A protein has these predicted regions:
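Conserved class I S-adenosyl-L-methionine
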Residues: 129-159
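A short acidic, Gly/Pro-enriched loop at the edge of an enzyme's catalytic core
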Residues: 89-101
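Class I SAM-dependent methyltransferase Rossmann-like catalytic core
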Residues: 1-39
């Protein structure tokens, strides 16, 4: 399977984060991600997709990788270095080898979100944790996107199939993963300019207090539970090496140059 083809829609998401609404969303997500990842400990952490984000910036694990479904784009500034390019439905990591996986807007732009989650569950150690970012369909932004699909005037990237938190919770439960923390945020209406987004900034506190589940974005943190197991100390092997089996970016670039040279 060609990973670039199976996840092509996510490419349109990165430029959207350069818009005023995108910058507003990105700032909120980065702040919440820093809070969540700072207190997660272990040895091996991976960010899957959207290298525009630095989701592991506040995390202190010794081994941290970022993977993506495509080669880095020279057209998108600020993208972090991608270590491995692979199909998101086939994670290039050993079974029970990762402590933390962060997926910023991966599931909603995937053709096979269930398979992506199954792969994440496979690579987790017992009590491994996943953090998932998504657009909330039950929000003013979600309503605006639904109208845009009918009128052709889209506010969010066209190809996203946004997943509600209750639905995501059901998917995770089937894989013995339990949501233990979560945040909703970005309560301003779907405005296209900084001026109007700032005018509605007062809604952040009001939204958190009065309608907390109607934020435009959510971030959930879930833990892989293993029945009958209770961890007293680290349950992983410190010497275990996580060796990505997909093709490193540098090798893919070299092969492309050789092919065209």
């Amino acid at each position: 399977m060609n990973p670039d083809a199976s996840f092509a829609p996510i490419i349109s998401l990165a430029p959207w984060f350069d818009t005023p609404a995108g910058a507003y969303a990105r700032a909120w997500e980065q702040s919440r991600l820093d809070e969540l990842t700072a207190d997660i400990f272990g040895y091996n952490a991976v960010q899957i997709g959207l290298p525009l984000f630095d989701t592991l910036a506040a995390n202190r694990m010794p081994n941290r990788w970022i993977t993506d479904s495509r080669l880095p784009s020279a057209e998108i500034s600020g993208e972090r270095q991608v270590v491995v390019v692979h199909d998101f439905t086939e994670l290039p990591f050993a079974t029970q080898s990762l402590d933390l996986v962060v997926m910023p807007h991966v599931l909603e732009f995937s053709a096979e979100p269930h398979q992506v989650l199954r792969e994440v569950e496979r690579v987790f150690i017992p009590e491994g944790q996943v953090i998932i970012c998504g657009f909330n369909p039950i929000s003013t932004w979600g309503a605006r996107q639904s109208v845009g699909r009918m009128t052709g005037a889209h506010f969010l990237p066209l190809h996203g199939e946004f997943i509600s938190v209750p639905r995501l919770k059901d998917w995770l439960k089937l894989l013995n993963m339990e949501i233990n923390r979560g945040h909703f945020g970005c309560y301003a209406p779907p405005c296209a300019t900084d001026k109007w987004l700032r005018r509605f900034s007062f809604l952040e506190k009001a939204g958190n207090r009065w309608w907390p589940y109607l934020g435009a974005l959510y971030i959930v943190q879930a833990i892989k539970r293993v029945q009958g197991m209770r961890l007293i100390g680290p349950a992983w092997d410190k010497k275990r090496a996580v060796v990505p089996s997909a093709m490193p970016v540098t090798n893919r670039m070299k092969k492309q140059r050789d092919r065209h040279g």
